[in-house]
Every structure is written in structure tokens, then in C-alpha cells.
Amino acid sequence: MGKGRFEAFSDGVLAIIITIMVLELKVPHGDTLAALAQQWPVFLSYVLSFIYVGIYWNNHHHLLHATSTVTGGMLWANLNLLFWLSLFPFTTGWMGENHFAPLPSAVYGVALLMAALAWWILQTLIVRAQGEDSVLKRALGSDWKGKLSPLLYLAGIVASFYVTGLAQAAYLLAALIWLVPDRRIERALAHEKH
């Protein structure tokens, strides 16, 4: 399979995930601020999940941009990632509809954790296919974000059963560290061209 088809399939699945999430947002019953305020947990859950899907899409784009080959293992690892991301609409809706209750918040964290582990597997297979001395391997470096995020998700899962606000803070913090643009791959590829 060519890289273009690989990217197009992934982009399509991610677009569908976002579409499903937005369709879960319900129109408030009533025309008052009080009616709208009842929807805030669902809306906040949607915003956080939208950010996560956007982060994965952006990083997926950069990772594949640095890839010259697509292997069968990479295809399966990518499907694994897309599977966990496809659970975001369910876990997002469940958490929001239940106002960040402990179990839905923990299950949301499990989906985040499994997506992070799936990302690590995909990234590892892509680096292996490119070679340990590749531009991609050098660009990724120690990957502190990739190591810190699962720890924050684990902390959030545990915190869900004690103080759900701490769980949400852990999930938000993980998203925020990824929102800071990471131009390592772009810089490494630009440097390689010169």
C-alpha cells in the first residue's frame, strides 16, 4: 500500500470520529441560558476530545511525512490506533452525559491511555522501518511528551475514583503539553534537505 492511501484512510476515519462526536451534541430544550448550561459537561467533553483527535491527526501527518515506506506491521498498528480513537465518541458522550462521574471519567482515561500506547507502537514500527539512524529517530529524540502522557492518563484514571476534577485536570494537562507546537520532525526534515 502506498503512503498516500495510508494517510487518506486515516484522515477519513479521524474525520468520521469528529463528525460522530459533534452529532452527539444535543440542542438544549428551551431558549434560556439555564437550558444551555445543562449541556456544559457534554460540550466540555466534546472540546477536550476534539483537541485530542486534532493532536493525533497533526502528529500522524508529521510522522507519515517523515516515512518513506509502509509495512504490514505499520498498517496493523495504525488500525490499532484508529480503533482506540474510534472509542472517543462513546467515552466522550458517556463522560459528558454523566457530568464527569467516576466510572465514565476512568473509562475515558483508559481510551486515552490505550490510544497513547497504540501511538507508541505505531511510532516504534515506523522508526524501525526508517532505521535507527534515520532523520525521524533523531527528530523524536527522548520523546518526553510520549512518556509523560501515559503517566498523566494513569493518574487521571486513578483520580477518577477519588476526585474527578483531578482526573479532568490530568487529561487536560496532557492535551496542553501536546498543543504546544512540536516542530522537531519539520526541522529535521528541512535540515536534511539542506
Regions found by a protein language model. Give the residues of each.
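Multi-pass alpha-helical transmembrane bundle typical of ion/small-solute transporters
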Residues: 1-194
